[in-house]
A protein has these predicted regions:
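Flexible "arm" and connector segments at domain edges
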Residues: 1-95
Length: 95
């Protein structure tokens, strides 16, 4: 996967502003939810090819937007991400 240059994220924040990028992130999350619903519906009825692509495309959009949300306060984001990671690590390793 291509790493996103932090400078590009900064340019986007300057160009569009924190509020607009946050609203865009909300929209992308909504599109991901819709794609996930369509994926499960198609999975049930056996027509998955296009819905898998749609699901992944929306997941990538959300991923890029979350990188921009991280740009708002990188230290706080990373601190919380570390706590969340430890939580899922415990769940994964629990017997």
């Amino acid at each position: 996967m291509k790493n996103i240059d932090p400078e590009i994220l900064g340019l986007l924040m300057v160009k569009y502003g924190e509020d607009e990028q946050t609203r865009q992130a909300m929209g992308e999350c909504g599109e991901f939810i819709a794609a996930a619903q369509n994926y499960y519906r198609a999975k049930k009825y056996g027509h998955r090819t296009e819905t898998v692509k749609d699901l992944i495309e929306e997941a990538v959009d959300v991923y890029f937007m979350m990188l921009q949300v991280r740009y708002i306060d990188q230290d706080m984001f990373d601190e919380i991400a570390e706590i969340k990671y430890k939580k899922i690590e415990r769940k994964a390793l629990a017997k």
